[in-house]
């Protein structure tokens, strides 16, 4: 289909809101086919679209989210979850020019969004790819601050999500990032931690 009409690679989605049961992500007006493929971790389609001229940094939807943001999102307790495919999709986008530092309308980078949705493997990969662990979103939170809070995303409270949260916190600590790190309001990572098990991890 792309060989017959290369313009499909850059065509914008027109429906106000689209939800596909096989892809656990909302798609909005202004998104491209690459957003849809990235959200579903369809790495083979991502490669094909990029080779056909799709822009890895396109962000014309109302949330100013690029395909890399969608690939960084996840629902780890959902039926379509696949951590390996997620990382492969992120790698493909970054290798073709996806900006790991790009912020959406809320100031969230792909790393913020991977942390928020408890995608531990994606967090580790994005950090290795140059993601900034101390970048602040518009609320002033760094990815490390989000790691110690209940974000209401990624199956929060479920055993798999809690274990992923532990892994993410360990990853930040292994990089030597201090729990004393302040957010935009001057609050430390430790000060944002409410659960005792998280506080114990931060002081260990």
Features from the language model and the residues they span:
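Ankyrin repeat domain, specifically the short helix-to-loop turn at the C-terminus of the second helix
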Residues: 2-8, 14-16, 47-55, 91-99, ...
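Leucine-rich solenoid repeat scaffolds
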Residues: 173, 178-204
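Ankyrin-repeat boundary/"N-cap" motif
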Residues: 11-33, 59-77, 103-109, 136-152, ...
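Conserved ankyrin/ankyrin-like repeat signature
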Residues: 44-45, 85-89, 121-122, 167-168, ...
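Eukaryotic tandem repeat interaction scaffolds
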Residues: 86, 99-139
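Ankyrin-repeat and related helical/solenoid repeat scaffolds used for protein-protein interactions
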Residues: 121-124, 128, 132-185
């Amino acid at each position: 289909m792309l060989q017959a009409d290369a313009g499909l690679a850059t065509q914008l989605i027109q429906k106000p809101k689209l939800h596909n049961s096989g892809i656990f992500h909302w798609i909005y007006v202004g998104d491209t086919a690459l957003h849809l493929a990235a959200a579903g971790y369809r790495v083979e389609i991502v490669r094909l679209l990029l080779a056909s001229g799709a822009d890895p940094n396109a962000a014309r939807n109302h949330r100013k989210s690029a395909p890399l943001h969608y690939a960084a999102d996840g629902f780890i307790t959902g039926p379509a979850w696949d951590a390996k495919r997620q990382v492969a999709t992120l790698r493909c986008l970054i290798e073709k020019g996806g900006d790991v530092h790009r912020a959406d309308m809320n100031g969230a980078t792909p790393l913020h969004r991977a942390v928020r949705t408890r995608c531990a493997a994606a967090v580790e990969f994005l950090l290795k790819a140059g993601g900034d662990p101390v970048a602040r979103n518009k609320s002033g939170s760094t990815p490390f601050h989000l790691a110690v809070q209940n974000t209401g995303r990624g199956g929060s409270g479920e055993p798999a999500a809690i274990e992923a949260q532990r892994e993410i916190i360990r990853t930040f600590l292994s990089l030597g990032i201090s729990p004393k790190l302040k957010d935009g309001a001057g609050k430390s990572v430790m000060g944002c931690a409410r659960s005792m098990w998280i506080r114990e991890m931060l002081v260990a």
